[in-house]
């Protein structure tokens, strides 16, 4: 494939912003430290300005405030350099469109609807009565069980699995090894053993949802587990049954969301977070990595952190500096207690 090439003026014509210097051609986006003359890079944080001076990048994306320090450099000036970088990167890595056709080793059960615009890879399985939208890409060894509904331009990467009865919105992307709609962990204890509760709900994903590799989203016990439009979930995340996750929320890797948790929209949940079940997390909540969420968060916009117990980020940061000194402080406390005890004995 011939690499895409854009001039700075072509980039700004498509994406906005202002180019300064020579109207050079660039072929890729690279970090400042690695970029060469044919590359474009970016400065998102002004504290790294020195790296721009040391960089061999042909052009750099900067904010208007930072641009004044780089006279003589080829620049694109943008309101948000990081977002602009992401959009430029997309120019060089466009979304792959489906090549219509069904591989001869794929199995499409009777009653399934697969438009001719869809790309169905080797060893794919499409269950009975499942309906695919236009332009879907179901790649090698992926499985879509019966009675599912997929919107237009859904992508299932190799070995992704969608269980029966699930609904995926438009432009959903499921990465390899992810499982959508496996049974939730519902059990009742009786007669010295566990009785499995049938999980009769399903999973519904909104438009533009992305699910990372080896992530599991369990089907609901009676109603659907749901994920709102634009939400992005990282690799190796566990979403329990009956969870309701809002729109445009992001959840980082190794997080576990227990069953029947409701998470609002525009939340940011760091890596390795764990929650108890049956709680609510308000819109625009930020939860730091490794936090144990033990109760509902009812106030929108909170920034929370802490291994245990959960507290505000400010409280956690203030207390965290003492963690590595707890043993020393405990010894000093015992010494002071002993001194006070001895002083009390002497005064008698």
Curated annotation (Swiss-Prot):
It comes from Neisseria meningitidis serogroup B (strain ATCC BAA-335 / MC58). Its EC number is 2.3.1.191. It comes from the Bacteria. Pathway: Bacterial outer membrane biogenesis; LPS lipid A biosynthesis. Belongs to the transferase hexapeptide repeat family. LpxD subfamily. Homotrimer. Signal peptide: none annotated. Keywords: Acyltransferase, Lipid A biosynthesis, Lipid biosynthesis, Lipid metabolism, Repeat, Transferase. Pfam families: Hexapep, LpxD. The keyword Lipid biosynthesis applies. This is UDP-3-O-acylglucosamine N-acyltransferase.
């Amino acid at each position: 494939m011939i690499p895409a090439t854009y001039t700075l003026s072509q980039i700004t014509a498509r994406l906005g912003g202002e180019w300064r210097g020579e109207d050079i051609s660039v072929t890729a986006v690279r970090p400042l430290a690695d970029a060469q003359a044919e590359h474009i890079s970016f400065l998102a944080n002004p504290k790294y300005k020195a790296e721009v001076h040391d960089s061999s990048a042909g052009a750099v994306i900067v904010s208007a405030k930072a641009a004044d320090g780089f006279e003589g450099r080829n620049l694109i000036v943008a309101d948000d350099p990081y977002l602009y970088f992401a959009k430029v990167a997309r120019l060089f890595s466009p979304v792959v469109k489906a090549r219509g056709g069904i591989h001869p080793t794929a199995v499409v059960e009777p009653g399934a609807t697969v438009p001719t615009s869809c790309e169905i890879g080797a060893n794919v399985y499409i269950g009975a009565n499942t309906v695919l939208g236009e332009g879907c890409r179901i790649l090698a060894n992926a499985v879509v069980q019966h009675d599912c509904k997929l919107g237009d331009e859904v992508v299932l990467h190799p070995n992704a699995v969608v269980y029966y009865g699930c609904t995926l919105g438009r432009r959903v992307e499921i990465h390899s090894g992810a499982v959508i709609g496996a049974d939730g962990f519902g059990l009742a204890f009786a007669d010295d053993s566990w009785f499995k509760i049938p999980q009769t709900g399903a999973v519904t994903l909104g438009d533009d949802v992305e699910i990372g590799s080896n992530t599991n989203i369990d089907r609901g016990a009676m109603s659907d587990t749901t994920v709102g439009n634009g939400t992005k979930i990282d690799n190796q995340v566990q979403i329990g049954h009956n969870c309701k996750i809002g729109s445009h929320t992001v959840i980082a890797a190794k997080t576990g969301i227990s069953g029947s948790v409701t998470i609002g929209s525009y939340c940011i949940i760091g890596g390795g977070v764990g929650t108890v079940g049956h709680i609510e997390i308000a819109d625009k909540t930020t939860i730091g990595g490794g936090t144990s969420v033990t109760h509902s968060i009812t106030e929108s916009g909170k920034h929370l952190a802490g291994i245990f117990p959960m507290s505000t980020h400010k409280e956690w940061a203030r207390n965290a500096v003492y963690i590595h000194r707890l043993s020393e402080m405990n010894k000093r406390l015992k010494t002071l207690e002993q001194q006070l005890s001895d002083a009390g004995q002497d005064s008698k």
